């Protein structure tokens, strides 16, 4: 992205902005695709999570299969530091020691990491890049959905830039400055460009334009718990 401040694409409505997408049935069908190890050392375990797999097990017995439960079979000391949405694929990091967990947790809490995602969205933005500033909170009557609320929401900021324009579809690189649940999905929906294949926030045409959520955690840059040096981990986008 350029050094100039990106355009502010914040929704203009200052009141709560819920999603108007009707609830869709959900059946958990975790993929057989194995969790791939990107990097392993005495402090970090960096993985490539497949789309459709929960990061941690859910309460129902049928939601037990998850990245965490699969990984613990081979790496019993690994602990979850952050999560990716079930349908999001890509880079996720786990800690191998208590000290590493604290170190990584503080980086997430204080927003010291750098994350970038790839998404394919419905429509073609007029600009080549932009910034979305739109506070978010739970949409309590419709959980697990989230919503934008300028009065009661928590700060949420997303930068985006166009990578490629197709016919009626655009490939974006997304750089979140905050880590709210469903942030990228809700922010893009709010400016009229829902992510393709999104069962929670996309209208029917955008939902059926892809066979999975078109959102991928491509790059995670962080300070290594061992010595504080910057390290970057990447998982190539599968779509």
What residues fall within each predicted segment?
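RNA pseudouridine synthases
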Residues: 2-239
């Amino acid at each position: 992205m350029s050094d100039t401040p990106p355009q502010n694409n914040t929704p203009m409505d200052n009141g709560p902005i819920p999603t108007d997408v009707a609830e869709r049935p959900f059946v958990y069908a975790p993929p057989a695709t194995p969790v791939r190890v990107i990097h392993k050392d005495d402090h970090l375990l960096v993985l490539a999570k497949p789309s459709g797999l929960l990061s941690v097990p859910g309460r129902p017995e049928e939601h037990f299969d998850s990245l965490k439960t699969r990984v613990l079979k081979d790496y019993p000391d690994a602990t979850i530091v952050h999560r990716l949405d079930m349908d999001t694929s890509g880079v996720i990091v786990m800690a191998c020691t208590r000290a590493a967990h604290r170190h990584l947790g503080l980086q997430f809490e204080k927003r010291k990491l750098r994350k970038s995602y790839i998404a394919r969205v419905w429509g073609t933005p007029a600009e080549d890049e932009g910034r979305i500033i739109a506070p978010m909170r739970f949409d309590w009557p419709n959980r697990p959905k989230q919503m934008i609320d300028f009065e009661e929401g928590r700060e949420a900021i997303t930068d985006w830039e166009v990578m490629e324009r197709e016919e009626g579809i655009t490939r974006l690189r997304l750089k979140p400055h905050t880590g709210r649940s469903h942030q990228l999905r809700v922010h893009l929906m709010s400016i009229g460009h829902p992510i393709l294949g999104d069962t929670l926030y996309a209208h029917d045409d955008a939902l059926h334009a892809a066979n999975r959520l078109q959102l991928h955690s491509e790059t995670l840059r962080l300070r290594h718990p061992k010595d504080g040096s910057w390290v970057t981990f990447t998982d190539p986008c599968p779509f």
